[in-house]
UniProtKB/Swiss-Prot annotation:
Gene Ontology MF terms: O-methyltransferase activity
EC number(s) on file: 2.1.1.-
Residues annotated as the enzyme's active site: 340 (proton acceptor)
UniProt keyword annotations, A-Z: Methyltransferase, S-adenosyl-L-methionine, Transferase
Involved pathway(s): Mycotoxin biosynthesis
Gene: CTB2
Species in which this protein is naturally found: Cercospora beticola
Function per UniProt: O-methyltransferase; part of the gene cluster that mediates the biosynthesis of cercosporin, a light-activated, non-host-selective toxin. The perylenequinone chromophore of cercosporin absorbs light energy to attain an electronically-activated triplet state and produces active oxygen species such as the hydroxyl radical, superoxide, hydrogen peroxide or singlet oxygen upon reaction with oxygen molecules. These reactive oxygen species cause damage to various cellular components including lipids, proteins and nucleic acids.
Listed name of the protein: O-methyltransferase CTB2
A GO BP annotation: methylation
Positions that bind S-adenosyl-L-methionine: 289
Cited Gene3D superfamilies: Vaccinia Virus protein VP39, Winged helix-like DNA-binding domain superfamily/Winged helix DNA-binding domain
Family: Belongs to the class I-like SAM-binding methyltransferase superfamily. Cation-independent O-methyltransferase family. COMT subfamily.
Length: 462
């Protein structure tokens, strides 16, 4: 994970920008990859350790450029710029509601009037023109004198990548109003632990949790959009589930001796369990989720994995069912992106449900964001983590947590749990948090694997 740039004057920041740009250019040149261009997608560079120089250079460029802009603008103009950022989301709400992007050809141009005619619904040429011209000012679409508009490499993704488009829709149309409603939610309910009292419910005028709303008959569209959005933000990026599989956790050690049963708690359709089963066929896997979700997972599970991966309906707020295990076989309870959906009140309840039946040979692995202390990572990474924390607050009254916040939960349940280590995948933003019963010592070889772990209670890369 890239370090924070501490330069604080014009020439130092410019030097950082030039140095990082040279490193990125050299890396791409050596790999025979295209250089960054406004007219093409970003270079396709896999998220792995070998490509760390590229991602470090890219992060340094972004941070230096943003710091330069803040420095040159000065405090007053920086505040004024922030005050107008919501206007971009307002324009995108119009773009997504009326699907402007779908009415612009991927090759060639069209006119504002033709877009308005195709949309109908009382949308005027003037509204289309004003909205698209505003979007073009921050890099979405290209406008041509005479009333014409074309796609660029950025806006075309709204047509060619429906999962990414779903994430953008979710952010603009659902999360944006929910965020604006946070003060009203606090005024109405106080600082609440309940998902039914989050900004989302206030924004739609109902006391209802977002997931409950999505499961209502007329919430199906938003539910489907949410599922696509989760795929969109995870595909190949810092939140890709493969960081959990290949990101430094020593899954191979679980195959030793009598082996382990890996229980994927809230595992959705089982994509993580199936990826692990492909790589470690001697392990057994059980995917737990809502009845309708595990039905889909079981149906779509490849035939050759069905003897390794089973699907069981289970409410993760309740204690684990009895598991059939062989003599000496351990159980790993794996929970990815679960606790952040919930306030501490309910996150503690989820962990308590896992702790109740935990044996000395068992462990819990949480795949969650671990928010670093201030100044420990680059500003872009730090901001993205806090952005996600606010998303959890506005939508569900959930939260992203620091290491100390996780440890407070582990200490509050009965029996008490012990944080063994936190492994941070090289290019991922979700850590692997390993927990056992208090007093249990992991084998020495399990600590500090492949340079990813900094030992017990160490947040790696932070």
């Amino acid at each position: 994970m890239a370090n924070r740039i501490e330069a604080d004057n014009l020439f130092e920041l410019t030097a950082e920008l030039v140095s990082a740009s040279a490193k990125l250019h050299k890396f791409l040149d050596q790999k025979n990859l295209p250089q960054p261009s406004f007219d093409a997608p970003a270079p396709s560079v896999a998220l792995n350790t070998a490509n760390k120089p590229y991602y470090d250079a890219r992060s340094a460029i972004v941070e230096a450029a943003e710091q330069l802009i803040r420095l040159v603008r000065g405090p007053r103009d920086t505040l004024l710029a922030l005050s107008f950022e919501h206007c971009a989301t307002a324009s995108m709400q119009v773009v997504f509601k009326y699907k402007f992007a779908n009415h612009i050809p991927l090759h060639g141009s069209t006119t504002y009037s033709k877009i308005a005619e195709a949309v109908g619904d009382g949308v005027t040429t003037a509204l289309v023109e004003r909205t698209i011209q505003h979007c073009a000012s921050f890099g979405l679409f290209e406008t041509i004198p005479g009333g014409y508009v074309t796609h660029n490499a950025t806006s075309s993704l709204l047509v060619t990548d429906p999962d990414l488009e779903a994430w953008m829709y979710l952010s603009a149309v659902i999360a944006y109003p929910a965020g604006a409603a946070i003060p009203k939610a606090v005024e109405q309910y106080g600082v609440s632990s309940e998902a039914t009292e989050a900004g989302y419910g206030v924004s739609i005028g109902r006391k209802i949790a977002q997931f409950q709303r999505f499961r209502e008959p007329d919430g199906k569209k938003d539910h489907e959009m949410f599922a696509r959005a989760m795929r969109g933000i995870a595909a190949g990026g810092a939140y890709d589930f493969r960081h959990a599989v290949d990101g430094g956790y020593p899954w191979h050690l679980l195959t030793e001796g009598a082996g382990h049963l890996v229980v994927d708690v809230g595992g959705g359709p089982g994509h993580v369990a199936m990826a692990l089963a492909e790589k470690y066929p001697s392990l057994r896997f059980q995917v737990q989720d809502l009845p309708e979700t595990v039905q889909v997972g079981a149906k779509n599970c490849p035939e050759h994995l069905r003897k390794h991966v089973t699907f069981v309906a289970h409410d993760f707020m309740t204690p684990q069912p009895a598991h059939e295990v062989q003599d000496g076989e351990g159980i790993v309870y794996f929970a990815r992106f679960i606790l952040h959906d919930w306030s501490d009140k309910y996150a503690t309840k989820i962990v308590q449900a896992l702790a109740t039946g935990l044996r000395p040979q068992d462990r819990i692995i949480l795949n969650e964001v671990v928010v670093p202390e201030a100044g420990q990572v680059g500003r872009e990474t730090e901001r993205r983590m806090h952005d996600r924390d606010l998303l959890m607050l506005m939508n569900l009254n959930g939260r992203e947590r620091t290491q100390s916040a996780f440890e407070a939960i582990f200490a509050s349940v009965t029996p008490k749990l012990r944080l063994q280590r936190v492994i941070h995948p090289e290019q991922g933003e979700l850590s692997l948090i390993e927990v056992t019963l208090d007093g249990v010592e992991l084998p020495a070889q399990a600590n500090g694997v492949n340079g990813h772990a900094n030992g017990t209670n160490g947040v790696n890369g932070h």
